[in-house]
Amino acid sequence: MIKNCCFFGHESLPVTWVIELKVMHEIEDLIQKGVADFYAGDLVGWDIICAKAVIRLRKVYPHIKLHLFLPRYNRFKVNGWDSNQKNDYNEILSDKEGVEIQYWSGSTTKLNKKLVELSDYCICYYDKNITASRTSQAIFMAQEKGLKIINLWVMYRNYSV
């Protein structure tokens, strides 16, 4: 049975090689367990790190797929993305075979609920001390549904270099 994984995490986080390596490792571990479909929304912060990892792993595991739920408005203008962020975004969208895009105009809460409903696993970057956030709401929904949650914030805090 093919299984699915979603990604939730804070928009602001330290992007380090340690985090990127841990994301790659966890995604590859899930692929070995039969996960083939990965779901992300928004492509900001954590989502972009995870999406890039899926795209890179497609070179080794061409059967996996990234499903993106992107907002209908232009994030480049809204958030004032720098050239690195724009390059990451364009790199992800350039994989025409491995990326499926659905445009989303609903609320973030409804999107997060949809991602949870589609998934069996959740790889997240979630600081439990930040309780009033969209990430905390999404993790609560994932816990309620019984998703296997892999929180890399905890791992990063324990093993960062």
Where is each model-derived feature located?
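Acidic/glycine-enriched connector segments
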Residues: 1-161
